[in-house]
């Protein structure tokens, strides 16, 4: 199975620009949603895992608009990314899929699951969502961190 950059790279035109992605493997669909940051892309986030995932799933590494090699669009990156996931699924005829979201991709995955629950079979987030323990009133989060730091254990993780 060819899981190289050039061997997996695909693209298609939408009414909001060209979306690019990487595709590999057979099996149920798995959409991998990347994080944000300078130079980030689906390929950079997941290239090390693609070969293993592709043995069990039909993998899609979507490059969100304005990231990787996809065309930029106007609007907030998380909002445009979430709508691009649905456009992507519609264009490829994917009724529903498992999703893994890293960082911003986790937030995008949660947004997609909340807006279109029938389109998301399963969702795994990696550092993507959760309560902010450092809010203006962080008592509970601070208490949990202090308890863990005082006597770290597997159970307290």
Q: What annotation goes with each model-predicted range?
A:
Residues 1-18:
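N-terminal cap/lid segment of alpha/beta-hydrolase-fold proteins
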Residues 14-15, 51, 61-100:
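Active-site loop/oxyanion-hole signature of alpha/beta-hydrolase fold enzymes
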Residues 15-69:
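Conserved HGGG/HGGXW glycine-rich cap/lid loop of the alpha/beta-hydrolase fold
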Residues 29, 56-58, 93-98, 119-122:
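Structural signature of beta-strand start/N-cap positions in the alpha/beta core
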Residues 34-36, 97, 101-106:
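Conserved alpha/beta-hydrolase "nucleophile elbow" surrounding the catalytic nucleophile
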Residues 42-45, 70-76, 134-137:
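Conserved catalytic-core motifs of eukaryotic protein kinase domains, centered on the activation segment
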Residues 70, 103, 127:
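Catalytic nucleophile serine of serine hydrolases
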Residues 107-115, 120-154:
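Flexible "cap/lid" loop of the alpha/beta hydrolase fold
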